[in-house]
């Protein structure tokens, strides 16, 4: 118990020393001490959101994705068809270079 109180006491002494050195050090300490708190709050929010979200929404998303994939496959099959005729037309339209 003494080690823990000594640890926090040393941190408090460091904070007071840096505060006396200037406002810039106080702002830096505030940011550095606030970042872990922000991370903990964010993780807590994400965990609560995942645990409390309705299970119905999770089950519906893959079904929609399957339908979209099927539609994309059909479109991709149509897009993969290559005709030789347009290439011939393009070559005929290209002007010949004078020699």
Curated annotation (Swiss-Prot):
Basic residues: which segments have biased composition? 65-74
From what superkingdom does this record's organism come?
Eukaryota
Predominant localisation class: membrane
Q: Which UniProt keywords apply?
A: Membrane, Transmembrane, Transmembrane helix
Q: Where is this region: Disordered?
A: 54-81
Membrane topology is:
Single-pass membrane protein
Q: What are the subcellular locations of this protein?
A: Membrane
Q: List the disulfide bonds.
A: none
* A cellular component term, taken from the record's GO annotations: membrane
Q: Where is the signal peptide?
A: none
State the InterPro entries in the record.
KIAA0040-like (IPR039964)
Q: Does the keyword RNA-binding apply?
A: no
Transmembrane parts of this sequence: 27-47
Instruction: Report the PANTHER family cross-referenced here.
Output: PTHR40382, RIKEN CDNA 4930523C07 GENE
**Any idea what this protein is called?**
Uncharacterized protein KIAA0040
Organism annotation: Homo sapiens (Human)
């Amino acid at each position: 118990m003494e080690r823990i109180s000594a640890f926090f006491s040393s941190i408090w002494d460091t904070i007071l020393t840096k505060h006396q050195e200037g406002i810039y050090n106080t702002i830096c300490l505030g940011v550095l001490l606030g970042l872990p708190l922000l991370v903990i709050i964010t993780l807590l929010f994400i965990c609560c959101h995942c645990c409390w979200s309705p299970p119905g929404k999770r089950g519906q998303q893959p079904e929609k994705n399957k339908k979209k994939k099927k539609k994309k496959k059909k479109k991709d099959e149509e897009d993969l068809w290559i005709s030789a005729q347009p290439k011939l037309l393009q070559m005929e339209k290209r002007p010949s270079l004078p020699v």
